[in-house]
């Protein structure tokens, strides 16, 4: 075949092909491109698999440290704690919380002293009592969450123009005698000129977790309840919220985290991580709306609808219930001990710089 015929034949063959030939004319360029793409995809799959395996291995080797936390009660008052858990802030610090609800500061403290719980979450007054008993391995408070009383006064009768002096001659369920809720409420009564020995009856015979039920069952004229229990009682037609105890009492270190001195000394990284997560929770709740907070913490309150949860969160926002940081200030601690002294529950004040360990909270602010 002469050269001219060969060229014509080659041109005709190219016209029949849906793609061009390579320069040598033996392998189509499309096949080369497809081969390259397949190779790239294969390499990507292999690299992705290696990354996934390494990530899984890292997760397996980096196990979370389990912390036994004993909280005084389950309340929207502690929304920053639940937000910190739900948002994964404790996991970010390598911690996993197992929560027990003690139903009373005395029960929380008993569990911590016995080693059944690593960290307690209740009123700092419990730490003061333990220190004054002379225990060598006393309790240190390392992070504060709430800065005022979180209970609301619920009346059996509706009173849109409530005054604290309206309580004269009534029976009230304020909690356990010696606990911060009881003492704070008593402090408010005295500040409003009410003689707590003669002009009212303070029924302290009912356990903390049974107060709402006792009131709904017909006991007393008033009861102090935390949210969402206060709003639920009102929604059920069993009572009416007439006042905020915390708003009337002013700032006081109401709820804080504490542990045995020995535990803190032996586990500084855990305490620092715990405090970091608590701070993140406080900041998150501050920066988000009541509705957003309610959605995040709803799993901790399965029996409360979202609207009521949001209302409860807003109630605490309205009274400025939460600390800006986990630092427990000396003037607030002194005020707590003043309230305890006036209630007749404290003979000797405990030293602030011994009971309160702000090192971990202050590390966050550096």
Residue ranges with predicted function:
Residues 1-66, 364-366:
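Short, low-complexity disordered leader/linker segments with a strong preference
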Residues 30, 61-197, 201-205, 214, ...:
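Short, glycine-/small- and polar/acidic-enriched structural segments
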Residues 49, 93, 140, 293-295, ...:
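Short, hydrophobic secondary-structure boundary micro-motifs
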Residues 77-80, 86, 105-108, 123-126, ...:
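Stable alpha-helical elements in mature extracytoplasmic
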Residues 135, 207-301:
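Pocket-lining segment of extracytoplasmic ligand-binding domains
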Residues 265-347:
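Secondary-structure end/capping motifs
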Residues 337-366:
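Conserved C-terminal helix/tail region of periplasmic/extracytoplasmic solute-binding proteins
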